[in-house]
């Protein structure tokens, strides 16, 4: 197994696992939680997270400069989101029930907080940028 491919495969596996989890959570929330508009915000947020994770998986699997830039942006959106929602939830608790990013992903063993850091650390490496064609091989 190619080491460069191996790391992206492991990241893609975990993102797939968490996307199923986030979309499953949002489906449950849409079906069984009180459908008042204020109660739909956590469901919408969980759906957004699940779809975001799917796009990150696609970016991790493709190898092009465009895919690298898009994946970098998506990872930054994910990190910003989990930090923002996690902080708001700790300080204020605005949602009637938890989201994927509540308390920095405590319900998911903090993986929503850890994964973007791992993804960013991997994607900015020189070898990874070269594999995506962002950095010219010397």
Where are these regions (language model features)?
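Topology signature of small-to-medium multi-pass alpha-helical membrane proteins
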Residues: 1-138
